[in-house]
């Protein structure tokens, strides 16, 4: 028994086989962790969107307290932000899917 076997350094063919097996075997814990991270990122993105919308729209639209024109301005600003967010999200998802399909990711 050599030192390489003690420290996990078996033959190169054994290392390749172990690495290939590890990559191809689906790990339910890893999958669950990826799902949890994806959910947390989605919540963080939604929170960031709400914060930016609130900050920008209210700063732009609230010129005087309780003015009726504030409501229309805020509604239009929110709609604009949501349309922009949807366009950007679709483009981002498309790029990620294309990169994943071509093996870049």
From Swiss-Prot:
Residue pairs linked by disulfide bridges in the UniProt entry: 57-77, 61-73
Compartments where located? Mitochondrion inner membrane; Mitochondrion intermembrane space
Q: Which organism is it from?
A: Saccharomyces cerevisiae (strain ATCC 204508 / S288c)
What GO molecular function terms would the record report?
metal ion binding; protein transporter activity
* Keyword hit for Membrane: yes
Q: What note about domains is in the entry?
A: The twin CX3C motif contains 4 conserved Cys residues that form 2 disulfide bonds in the mitochondrial intermembrane space. However, during the transit of TIM13 from cytoplasm into mitochondrion, the Cys residues probably coordinate zinc, thereby preventing folding and allowing its transfer across mitochondrial outer membrane.
- Recorded protein name is Mitochondrial import inner membrane translocase subunit TIM13
Q: Region Disordered: which residues?
A: 1-27
